[in-house]
């Protein structure tokens, strides 16, 4: 699925470039990374001082080293706009780090040494930031709190507008009806059988004719004794062939049928109103569950719970 993951707040792939603007332009990322860095520095400096005066728990050194790489990883993921790609791993590392920092707080907070108490304060800050990050990165992009937080970021897209949906028919499934354009003839091909009113190809004759006799007078039928030039019969045959092709294209057998299997399920992350000029599109509401048959293009063949089928833009859906 072409997820357009940027709209989820950090969905670039592993090849995304490092850009500090993704941190500076996101108040949430900037604040949490700054607090985590400050907490780590407080804990690190205080641990060095506490280790000079008296014995310091070795376990807390491991917690400091571990959280250093966790903060570095979160910073790189946000700066590279790759949060959506690595959010599962980030939550796992943060959960383990939360255990380490809270254990360090328990081993330092009850000492009378001011340095150890300061180190415990730094670990408390790290624990608080870890809880916030787990709640943020561990939630779906459609969660209300994530959408509220992401709305303040400069680089994170929001609900796509109808003006951005300039998708061509080449990306659509085979659900649109097509018809062959009628072939046009010039005067030399008609050889004197031109008519002042256009021929529509309907059995009733030309458009605007009041009676069938009036429209048929310009074109004598074979049984009426008319003399035809040599090139009339090929024209008549070709016209009949075109009419037959047009009937074949509009017959029920030639029309596209929706698929019978919908192996995928998708959730609407935004509400969508179908284009009134396109009968193939369907409307749906935010958080509505749709069944999808094909996810290879920008427009997906979808089926609603009420049985309504049609095409839906992929950038409004997320696979479940």
From Swiss-Prot:
It holds the Pfam family SH3_1. Residues 261-320 form the SH3 domain. One of its GO terms (cellular component) is plasma membrane. Residues 232-251 have a biased composition (Low complexity). It is a multi-pass membrane protein. GO terms for biological process: regulation of actin filament polymerization. It is found in: Cell membrane. The chain crosses the membrane at residues 30-50, 60-80, 82-102, 118-138. Glycans are attached at residue 58. Forms homooligomers. Plasma membrane osmosensor that activates the high osmolarity glycerol (HOG) MAPK signaling pathway in response to high osmolarity. This is High osmolarity signaling protein SHO1B. It comes from Hortaea werneckii.
């Amino acid at each position: 699925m072409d997820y357009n993951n940027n709209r989820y707040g950090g969905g670039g792939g592993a090849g995304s470039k490092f850009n500090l603007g993704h941190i500076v332009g996101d108040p949430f990322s900037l604040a949490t990374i700054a607090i985590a860095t400050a907490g780590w520095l407080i804990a690190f400096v205080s641990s060095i001082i506490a280790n000079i005066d008296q014995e310091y728990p070795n376990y807390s050194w491991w917690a400091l080293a571990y959280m250093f790489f966790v903060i570095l990883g979160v910073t790189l993921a946000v700066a590279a706009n790759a949060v959506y790609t690595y959010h599962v791993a980030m939550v796992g590392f943060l959960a383990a780090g939360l255990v380490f920092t809270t254990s360090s707080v328990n081993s330092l907070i009850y000492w009378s040494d001011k340095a150890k108490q300061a180190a415990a304060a730094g670990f408390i800050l790290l624990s608080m930031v870890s809880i916030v990050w787990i709640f943020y990165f561990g939630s779906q992009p459609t969660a209300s709190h994530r959408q509220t937080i992401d709305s303040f970021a400069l680089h994170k897209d929001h609900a796509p507008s109808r003006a951005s949906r300039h998708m061509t028919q080449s990306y659509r499934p085979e659900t649109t009806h097509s018809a062959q354009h009628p072939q046009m003839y010039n005067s030399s091909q008609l050889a004197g059988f031109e008519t002042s009113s256009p021929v529509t190809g309907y059995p009733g004759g030309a458009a605007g004719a009041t009676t069938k006799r009036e429209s048929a007078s310009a074109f004598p039928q074979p049984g009426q004794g008319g003399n035809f030039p040599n090139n009339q019969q090929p024209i008549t045959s070709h016209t009949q062939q075109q009419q037959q092709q047009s009937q074949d294209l509009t017959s029920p057998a030639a029309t596209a049928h929706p698929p019978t299997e919908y192996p995928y399920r998708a959730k609407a992350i935004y509400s969508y109103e179908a284009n009134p000029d396109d009968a193939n599109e369907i409307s749906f509401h935010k958080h509505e569950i749709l069944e999808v048959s094909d996810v290879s293009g920008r427009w997906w063949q979808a089926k609603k719970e009420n049985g309504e089928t049609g095409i839906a833009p992929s950038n409004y859906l997320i696979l479940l």
